[in-house]
Amino acid sequence: MNAWEQRKFGELAEYKKGPFGSTITKSMFVPKSDESVKVYEQQNAINKDSSLERYFLPKEYAYTKLKAFEVHSGDIIVSCAGTIGEIYEIPDNAEYGVINQALMRVRVDEKIVDKRMFIIAFSNMINEFTRTHSNGSAIKNIPPFADLKPMKVLMPSMEEQKVISECFEKMDYLITLHHRKLICVKNALKFTQNDIIREKL
């Protein structure tokens, strides 16, 4: 096995926090249309669902004022306020949009780190930060870039990263498969119980 290399989070990805609150206000929102752009919110990261939507901005405003905050498939969004550290990768079929002030966009440098490995390492880092800085109360904001980027993590070679990533992917598949089977069994049990009760009546 190759030696693991120490890396800084600032080397592994490009990070962009959402715009200042005054850049996106409710007075700017418009109904969804061909001339609007979706605003991604914390609910998308927390619920791991890109289809959730509430607010839209005029396309011209988003393209001219919020270009730096746009979100594409493959980008990672992270919740930054309140419920912090929820991580979600935007899927291939997701709608184009921009992030609001409560999110951070992460673009992983996949030449040096596998995206799944990054997500695991980043999530662990946030959990450790929360644990060591909570002082008995909830952490309400993600670490500032000045603290986040210098944080160090051990990373294996890309070859080993891919092997580890594939292993986790298979485990996720099995968990999902067994979860679906469990739901089917529970539904069958409920149906049987109801059927027995009806017969007794």
Can you say where each PLM-predicted feature lies in the sequence?
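Structural detector for helix-capping/boundary residues
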Residues: 7-12, 43, 101, 195
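Amphipathic alpha-helical segments with low aromatic content
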Residues: 1-7, 150-151, 157-201
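A short glycine-rich beta-alpha junction/loop motif
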Residues: 31-32, 80, 96-104, 136-159
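A short beta-sheet element
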Residues: 39-43, 57-123
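Glycine- and charge-enriched low-complexity intrinsically disordered segments
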Residues: 117-136
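DNA target-recognition patches
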Residues: 10-16, 26-61, 106
